[in-house]
Swiss-Prot record:
Binding-site positions, Mn(2+) 2: D131, H133, D214, D216
GO biological process, one term: putrescine biosynthetic process from arginine, via agmatine
Alphabetical list of PROSITE patterns matching this protein: ARGINASE_1, ARGINASE_2
Keyword Manganese recorded: yes
Lineage: Archaea, Methanobacteriati, Methanobacteriota, Methanomada group, Methanobacteria
GO terms assigned for molecular function: agmatinase activity; metal ion binding
Transmembrane segments: none
Binding site for Mn(2+) 1: H110, D131, D135, D214
The keyword Metal-binding appears for this protein: yes
Record's keyword terms, sorted: Hydrolase, Manganese, Metal-binding
Gene3D superfamilies, sorted: Ureohydrolase domain
Entry cofactors: Mn(2+)
Name used for this protein in its record: Uncharacterized 32.2 kDa protein in hmfB 3'region
CDD domains membership: Agmatinase-like_2 (cd11593)
Length: 285
């Protein structure tokens, strides 16, 4: 395979890690439903590249990286074919789960999250959705499966709860839908203006959690290289504080999506890698 995530272990080491929480990392270089800025197919590579910019020690947590992560490479995608790409995603995630690993998936556009979460029994799972957009359209550009419809399709899988964090863009129909279905959301202004209140509300939630992070949840000043940049976003500090709370609880999977750049050093890729490291440092093993 090509470039691996920094500090990741060889797959052959899995047999020696049976007593530890192990993360299996997969890339999904798919962006065929992108509608504004394509390029998230380069996201897995750019996040891996950015991972080498960080130390394996956290000054904040006063600890070395002690959670094993095994980079399993990229899933085969068929550009222009969501259905078969989604099938490939689900099959690979099932393999990761059968090996007792927790999946971390790097996109790619946000539609790929559907292929990941449909492998789980979601009846007791809370989906934590960090995003600038609600992604609750029933159809978008004539398609039922799209980066703009992904959370609507996930809602139809009947998770215990969906909580949307950092949203600031939607259609009238999407807003009416989340209100009618009692889907909880916190806007970016809620977070900026009432951060401690929102943080406490998130801390009260029960896991297990599946966490999906569209990097455009960050303000474009921190993450310009995304598929749909939207001003008045949250900051990396807000993300770090959310992760501190979330990582104390049971997490069944994580994805980070919509890094849309092919430029080494792009802040979107750097922040995506930092978010992943924050989870790995904060999670208890």
């Amino acid at each position: 395979m090509g470039l691996k995530f920094a500090y990741s272990k060889d797959p052959s080491s899995l047999k020696y890690l049976s007593n530890k929480k192990v993360f299996g990392l997969l890339g999904v270089p798919f962006d065929s439903t992108s509608t504004y800025k394509p390029g998230s197919r380069f996201g897995p590579l750019m996040i891996r590249q950015a991972s080498y910019n960080f130390e394996n020690y956290s000054l904040h947590y006063r600890k070395k990286l002690d959670v094993p992560i095994i980079d399993l490479g990229d899933i085969e995608v068929i550009l222009g074919d969501f259905k078969n790409t989604c099938r490939n995603i689900s099959e690979k995630v099932q393999e990761v789960l059968k090996k007792g690993m927790i999946p971390i998936v790097l996109g790619g556009e946000h539609s790929i999250t559907y292929g990941v979460v449909k492998t789980f029994d979601l009846s007791d799972v809370t989906i934590l959705h960090f995003d600038a957009h609600m992604d609750m359209a029933n159809t978008y550009a004539g398609k039922k499966f799209s980066h703009a419809t992904v959370m609507r399709r996930i809602y139809e899988l009947h998770p215990k709860k969906i909580v949307q964090i950092g949203v600031r863009s939607c259609t009238k129909e999407e807003h009416e839908f989340v209100l009618n279905e009692n889907i909880k959301y916190y806007t970016s202004r809620d977070i900026i203006e009432k951060f401690n209140m929102v943080l406490n509300e998130i801390n009260k939630l029960d896991g297990p959690f599946y966490v999906t992070v569209d990097i455009d949840v960050l303000d474009p000043g921190y993450a310009p290289g995304v598929g749909n940049p939207t001003p008045v976003g949250i900051t990396p500090y807000h993300m770090e504080k959310f992760i501190e709370k979330i990582a104390r609880k049971k997490i069944i999977g994580i994805d980070i999506v919509e890094v849309a750049t092919d430029r080494i050093g792009d802040p979107a890729a750097m922040n995506a890698a930092k978010i992943l490291y924050d989870f790995l440092f904060a999670i208890k093993i």
